[in-house]
Amino acid sequence: MTFPVEKVRADFPILQREVNGLPLAYLDSAASAQKPNQVIDAESAFYRHGYAAVHRGIHTLSAQATESMENVRKQASRFINARSAEELVFVRGTTEGINLVANSWGAENIRAGDNIIISEMEHHANIVPWQMLCERKGAELRVIPLHPDGTLRLETLAALFDDRTRLLAITHVSNVLGTENPLPDMIALARQHGAKVLVDGAQAVMHHAVDVQALDCDFYVFSGHKLYGPTGIGILYVKEALLQEMPPWEGGGSMISTVSLTQGTTWAKAPWRFEAGTPNTGGIIGLGAAIDYVTSLGLDKIGDYEQMLMRYALEQLAQVPDITLYGPAQRLGVIAFNLGKHHAYDVGSFLDNYGIAVRTGHHCAMPLMAWYGVPAMCRASLAMYNTHEEVDRLVAGLTRIHRLLG
């Protein structure tokens, strides 16, 4: 059975619009995916008919909103096959989830002389929090280097570990190169040294199923807005035993058990002690609708379609004169490229004139840009609603730009 891409496209109202008098070809889903009617309608219905502050409310609307929120926690736990819904913390997104781990688990467990391992392909969200932590603690940040094809030099990884390695923080899929890292092998090596493992799953969960129990990672984090859900909501998974030991990193309402001016404060149990203040309940409802949506289509079918489209795109783009493609042949979601010596911003601006939306810049991966010796790249993302025709338009646009700019 073929993937129903036209039916899927009909669910996304923004795909019906034009840009500069041409049909929109949205090739920027790795930055933020568009939203289907099912997500828009679910969040709208909540605000129209079901909104109330969650927790402790005795009235019907509050009780129903709280139940809806906790049902999404259960739904998200099934989505990544967590052992328990109480292993999931609602966060604003991947960035906040990583910072939570750094400022809670990291603050308690990293000591002077310890080390944390990351890779050269990481998003800044999985670099900067660890830099800040290491600077505060007197710890060392170690880096897995790259091969020219955009895969990690895994032969160097074993030498980076020692008895002071406390954490491996690694992206599941590179947001620039599309490289899917071999997590089982990397996690097994971390286990040999007693290190914990955090996985940045922001670019993975929309492309194929994720099973955190099978991975045996300690932390897994992703954002809703890249999964066709709302902005301002994400999921941090933490193994229950670890989560129960972690102290809160933000104080306020909802995360306490008792507060006394003379006796101090006691915390709520996890995960609620990590959810200070009024949550983004509407975003949580929208995230649940997004999970429902991709689950109903089947992540295996989505993945098969996207891989077929990726193969086609790589074949066609390789024929564009003076193009440089970055990353491995086998990849997920993104194609980074440059056209001759032209700056990525110029290429992206021309493509926008043709109604084609791509991302340009350093993609929050400046160390990776430095490794390739370029200030910026163009990046085209392929999502489940993209088509062969849109790939053809991208190729034609780049060919025309090459002809115009020389």
Swiss-Prot record:
It comes from the Bacteria. GO terms for cellular component: cytoplasm. One of its GO terms (molecular function) is pyridoxal phosphate binding. Its EC number is 2.8.1.7, 4.4.1.16. The active site is at 364 (cysteine persulfide intermediate). Keywords: Cytoplasm, Lyase, Pyridoxal phosphate, Transferase. It catalyses: (sulfur carrier)-H + L-cysteine = (sulfur carrier)-SH + L-alanine; L-selenocysteine + AH2 = hydrogenselenide + L-alanine + A + H(+). Its cofactor is pyridoxal 5'-phosphate. The keyword Transferase applies. One of its GO terms (biological process) is cysteine metabolic process. Gene3D superfamilies: Aspartate Aminotransferase, domain 1, Type I PLP-dependent aspartate aminotransferase-like (Major domain). Pathway: Cofactor biosynthesis; iron-sulfur cluster biosynthesis. Transmembrane segments: none annotated. The modification N6-(pyridoxal phosphate)lysine is found at residue 226. It is found in: Cytoplasm. InterPro entries: Aminotrans_V_dom (IPR000192), Aminotrans_V_PyrdxlP_BS (IPR020578), Cys_dSase_SufS (IPR010970), PyrdxlP-dep_Trfase (IPR015424), PyrdxlP-dep_Trfase_major (IPR015421), PyrdxlP-dep_Trfase_small (IPR015422). PANTHER family: CYSTEINE DESULFURASE. Cysteine desulfurases mobilize the sulfur from L-cysteine to yield L-alanine, an essential step in sulfur metabolism for biosynthesis of a variety of sulfur-containing biomolecules. Component of the suf operon, which is activated and required under specific conditions such as oxidative stress and iron limitation. Acts as a potent selenocysteine lyase in vitro, that mobilizes selenium from L-selenocysteine. Selenocysteine lyase activity is however unsure in vivo. Belongs to the class-V pyridoxal-phosphate-dependent aminotransferase family. Csd subfamily. Homodimer. Interacts with SufE and the SufBCD complex composed of SufB, SufC and SufD. The interaction with SufE is required to mediate the direct transfer of the sulfur atom from the S-sulfanylcysteine. This is Cysteine desulfurase. The lineage of its organism: Bacteria, Pseudomonadati, Pseudomonadota, Gammaproteobacteria, Enterobacterales.
